[in-house]
C-alpha cells in the first residue's frame, strides 16, 4: 500500500515508468506494484545481485511472501527492459555469489549438458568473480531461462522445469522462517540434491548424474548446503510445508 500510495500522491499515470534498482526482492516488489498500479504501467529492472541477474529479473514473475508461503501473491508482468551490469557484482560476498550460482547450475542441469560440463571446470572462476567466466555464465543462464519463458509465459507446463530444486527450497526457507542463516540460493542447492535423489529413486535419472552434481558441490565447498537436510527426520519436518506449495496440482 505504501508504494502504491506514493505513486498516487505523485500523480503517476499509465504513461509513466517505474525503475527498479536492486536485488531480487526490490525487483519483485517493483514489478508487482507496476503490474497492479492502474492496471499496469511500464517498468525497467536493473538487477544488482548475481541471483537477480540470472533469475528473478528474467521471465516476468513478480511476487511477495505471505505467512502461508513464499511468492503466493504475485503476477506475471514483463519489464520493458532489463539491464545487467556485472560491476555491481564486485561488492557481493561469497554467500551472495553462491545464491546466484545456484540458479546458474540449475539452468545447466535442466537444459544444457555442455554448459554443465563447462561449469564442472569453471565454477570456481564464477564464484571468484572472474569477469570473463562470470559474463558468459550470466548470458548463458539468461538464454536458457528465456528459452522456457518464451514458450510458456504463464507457467502452464514447460516453464515449470525452472522450478527444479525450488519445491524443497521453499519448504526449507519457510521452515526456517526465511532466516538469513540460510539464503535462497543455499536452499535451492539443497533442494536440487534432494530432488535429484528423489528422481534417482523414481528411476528418472541415474546415480551418475547425482554424483556429478555432488562432485561440483564438493569441489566448490557447497556440500554444507544439503548435508543437514539429508536425514529422514529433517525431510519429514519439511513435508507439511510442501503441501501448500503453489506448484502443487493435486
Model regions and ranges:
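N-terminal small/polar loop signature for handling phosphorylated ligands or for N-terminal nucleophile
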Residues: 1-44
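A glycine/threonine-rich phosphate-anchoring loop and its flanking beta-alpha core
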Residues: 31-125
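Catalytic Zn2+-binding segment of zinc metalloproteases
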Residues: 33, 38-41, 171-180
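Short glycine/serine- and small hydrophobic-enriched flexible loop segments
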Residues: 35, 103, 174, 193-201
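Short alpha-helical scaffolding segments that buttress acidic/His motifs in well-ordered protein cores
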Residues: 101-105, 137-148, 192, 217, ...
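C-terminal charged capping/lid subdomain of soluble metabolic enzymes
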Residues: 102, 204-250
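Oxyanion-binding "anion nests"
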Residues: 123-178
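Small-residue-rich helix-loop
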Residues: 186-194
Amino acid at each position: 500500500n505504501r508504494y502504491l500510495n506514493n505513486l498516487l500522491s505523485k500523480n503517476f499515470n499509465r504513461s509513466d515508468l517505474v525503475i527498479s534498482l536492486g536485488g531480487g526482492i526490490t525487483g519483485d516488489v517493483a514489478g508487482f506494484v507496476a503490474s497492479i498500479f492502474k492496471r499496469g504501467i511500464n517498468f525497467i529492472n536493473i538487477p544488482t545481485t548475481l541471483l537477480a541477474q540470472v533469475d528473478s529479473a528474467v521471465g516476468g514473475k513478480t511476487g511477495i511472501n505471505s505467512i502461508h508461503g513464499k511468492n503466493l501473491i504475485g503476477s506475471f508482468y514483463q519489464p520493458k527492459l532489463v539491464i545487467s551490469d556485472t560491476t555491481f557484482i564486485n561488492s557481493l560476498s561469497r554467500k551472495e555469489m553462491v545464491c546466484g550460482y545456484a540458479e546458474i547450475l540449475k539452468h545447466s542441469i535442466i537444459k544444457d549438458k555442455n554448459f554443465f560440463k563447462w561449469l564442472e571446470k569453471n565454477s570456481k572462476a564464477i564464484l571468484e568473480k572472474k569477469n570473463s567466466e562470470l559474463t558468459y555464465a550470466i548470458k548463458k543462464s539468461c538464454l536458457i531461462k528465456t528459452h522456457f519463458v518464451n514458450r510458456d509465459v504463464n507457467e502452464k507446463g514447460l516453464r515449470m522445469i525452472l522450478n527444479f530444486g525450488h519445491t524443497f527450497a521453499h519448504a526449507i526457507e519457510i521452515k526456517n522462517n526465511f532466516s538469513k542463516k540460510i539464503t535462497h540460493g543455499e536452499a535451492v542447492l539443497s533442494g536440487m540434491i534432494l530432488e535429484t535423489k528423489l528422481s534417482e529413486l523414481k528411476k528418472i535419472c541415474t546415480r551418475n548424474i547425482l554424483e556429478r552434481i555432488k562432485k561440483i558441490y564438493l569441489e566448490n565447498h557447497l556440500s554444507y548446503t544439503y548435508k543437514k537436510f539429508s536425514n529422514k527426520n529433517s525431510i519429514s519436518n519439511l513435508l507439511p510445508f510442501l503441501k501448500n506449495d503453489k506448484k502443487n496440482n493435486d
